[in-house]
Amino acid sequence: ISRALFKDAVSVLSLGDGNKNPAATLKVSTAGKLTYSDLVSFWNGFDPYELNTVIASPDIAAAILNMPEMRDAAAGLNFHATGKAVTPLGANMLKSSAAQAGTLIGLDKNCALEMVEAGGLLTEYDKLIDRQIERAAITQTAGFAKIFTDASKILTTKA
């Protein structure tokens, strides 16, 4: 359920919630190549919001971790000791295939998105004694809405 909700959240961040409010898409300076300068420009474009979370496609996460700026001795020591990778400009980085290849989604987690739920988590059980079958269904009704459109942006390496 949590993976499906995360995928829905990424979709709403990228495409909007049906109110003509998709995230602004910015392109890197050189198509197909992400640079530290691109990350700084992306971070700088969030004023008055704070870029505190990024959702990176697996290829972009690897590109960020392979940047010389992300491979200094202290960052490497922390990564090897704790397993926590250094993050771009202090933002919490989530690697997910829910983001399209070549895409980095940046957001202010306090202002970009809200989860709207109808009821809670519902668990139902069913038993057929004569056939020795037992099954369970777990459902949740939820959706996402954007709070402030400018609190999320997309950086793409595509031309």
Segments the model singles out, each with a brief description of its role:
Residues 68-159:
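Sequence/fold signature of self-assembling virion shell proteins
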Residues 1-46, 154-159:
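Alpha-helical scaffold segments that mediate packing/assembly in large oligomeric complexes
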Residues 2, 6, 44-48, 66-70, ...:
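Generic surface-pattern signal
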Residues 27-34, 40-91:
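A contiguous, surface-oriented mixed alpha/beta subdomain in the mid-to-C-terminal portion of proteins
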